[in-house]
Structure formats: C-alpha cells, structure tokens
C-alpha cells in the first residue's frame, strides 16, 4: 500500500494570521510540522498542498515537496483531494499544518488499521480526557468525539459531549485530534459532496462524512497533540522547543 502524508497549508488563517510562517526557534511553523511528519514510519513521502507561493518558496528551500492548489478549497481535506489528483498513492493522511509538536508515532496510528488489512472509510485519532478536566471539555476550540462500542465515531462537536448530568466524574471524554487517513476513493467522494448542514453549524469537515453515511474509525492515542490557533498556543510551542524536550 502506497501511503502519502499530505499537509494542507494556507497563509490567511482566521484566528492567527500567517501562522504557517511563524518563527519557532529559527524555523517556520510549517517546516517544524514537516520535520516531524518525515519521521513517521508508515511512509517516507510528505507533501504540502498550498495555494500560497510564499509558503511554497519557503518549503522548497528546505527540499519539502509541494503541490500548488487553487484557492477554492473549503477545507483541508478538499485541498488534499485536489492535490491527490496529481499524486500516486492508495492512502492519503491529512496532517494539519499547525501541528509542530505532532509525535510521528501518532501519524503511524491512523495508518495502522489499513496496514493490518482493514478497510475503513476513514480513520482519525482521539485522546481520552477525564471528566474532571472541565476547562478542556467546555472549550469550544477543543473538538470532542463520541464513539460506539466498535470504535467508530457517532458524532463530533465543539460542545461537551456526552452531556454531563450531575457530578459523575467516571465518564471519559474524547478529544479529537485532527489527523485523518482516507482511501483515495473516499477522499474523492468527500470532495464531490457539498458541505453538510452539521458541518457548517459546527465548522467541522468530518461531519460531512458522517452525514453522508461514511464511517470514521477512531484510534485512541495516549499522546496529546496541541495545535497552534492562538498567540498563546504559539508561545507555548515556542517554549517547548526552547526547552528542547527529548521527545523533539
């Protein structure tokens, strides 16, 4: 099975302008993400899909493969589907460009079911969060998932799900980590669908799959992977790199 990691990247992000080129200890954020992606064992091919000549120029200087896409993509997976038209591959891993702390082993996790011979429509990652972590659970920037007994997603939301009734602290919540693996044909079908009602309401592209009858297998990880969406999160990541943790 030929696997390709594709990182969608745009310059005009909403909450943190030009974050892909933000400096993190001498390297742009997008380069830091690519460096960790290249350490994944499931593939040695990492491609960035972007509509920004500025991002493309930065990446080519450090020998990262780039596919230029149009400005019409409505989400990262649509951008990847466009890039996939010019790429060979059976499985495409959508890794967010704002994940400079991503553990390469977690990238391997989304590919693992396919490498075992399974054929889910799509896989993604979830991270368990104790019910006592109310600040995380209530944060609308943290996407939560509920999954069935077979490990497939029932729903994703920015709201706290399941609803907490009373003071029961035994419930485990799941934080969604936005890495996806798509079979080529599912990725193509996804891109051909119009954004769904719930997708637009929650601003979560994966709901387009669920609303159209696709199943998303959720793989649990014990390694969290905070993204960069705010100045505070950017400074947190910079501090981690300055401290030069062994995991990096």
Curated annotation (Swiss-Prot):
Keywords: Cytoplasm, Lipopolysaccharide biosynthesis, Nucleotidyltransferase, Transferase. It catalyses: 3-deoxy-alpha-D-manno-oct-2-ulosonate + CTP = CMP-3-deoxy-beta-D-manno-octulosonate + diphosphate. Its main location: cytoplasm. It is an enzyme of class 2 (transferase). CDD domains: CMP-KDO-Synthetase. InterPro entries: Cytidylyl_trans, KdsB, Nucleotide-diphossugar_trans. Pathway: Nucleotide-sugar biosynthesis; CMP-3-deoxy-D-manno-octulosonate biosynthesis; CMP-3-deoxy-D-manno-octulosonate from 3-deoxy-D-manno-octulosonate and CTP: step 1/1; Bacterial outer membrane biogenesis; lipopolysaccharide biosynthesis. GO terms for molecular function: 3-deoxy-manno-octulosonate cytidylyltransferase activity. Its EC number is 2.7.7.38. It holds the Pfam family CTP_transf_3. GO terms for biological process: CMP-keto-3-deoxy-D-manno-octulosonic acid biosynthetic process; lipopolysaccharide biosynthetic process. It is found in: Cytoplasm. One of its GO terms (cellular component) is cytosol. Activates KDO (a required 8-carbon sugar) for incorporation into bacterial lipopolysaccharide in Gram-negative bacteria. Belongs to the KdsB family. NCBIfam families: kdsB, PRK05450.1-5, PRK13368.1. This is 3-deoxy-manno-octulosonate cytidylyltransferase. The lineage of its organism: Bacteria, Pseudomonadati, Chlorobiota, Chlorobiia, Chlorobiales.
């Amino acid at each position: 099975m030929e696997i390709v990691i594709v990182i969608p990247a745009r310059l005009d992000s909403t909450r943190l302008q030009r974050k892909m080129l933000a400096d993190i200890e001498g390297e742009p954020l997008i380069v830091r993400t690519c460096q960790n992606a290249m350490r994944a064992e499931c593939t040695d091919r990492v491609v960035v899909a972007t509509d920004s000549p500025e991002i493309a120029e930065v990446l080519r200087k450090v020998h990262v493969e780039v596919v230029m896409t149009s400005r019409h993509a409505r989400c990262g997976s649509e951008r990847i589907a466009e890039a996939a038209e010019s790429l060979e591959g059976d499985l495409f891993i959508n890794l967010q460009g704002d994940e400079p702390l991503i553990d390469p082993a977690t990238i391997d996790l989304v590919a693992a079911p396919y490498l075992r011979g399974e054929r889910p429509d799509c896989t993604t990652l979830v991270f368990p969060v104790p019910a006592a972590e109310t600040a995380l659970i209530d944060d609308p920037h943290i996407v939560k998932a509920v999954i069935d007994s077979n490990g497939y997603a029932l729903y994703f939301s920015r709201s706290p799900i399941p609803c907490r009734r009373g003071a029961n602290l035994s419930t485990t919540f799941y934080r969604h980590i936005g890495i996806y693996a798509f079979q080529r044909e599912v990725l193509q079908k996804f891109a051909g669908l119009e954004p769904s009602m719930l997708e637009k309401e929650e601003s979560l592209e994966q709901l387009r799959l669920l609303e159209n009858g696709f199943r998303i297998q959720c793989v649990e990880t014990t390694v969290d992977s905070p993204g960069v969406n705010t100045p505070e999160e950017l400074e947190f990541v910079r501090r981690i790199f300055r401290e030069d943790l062994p995991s990096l």
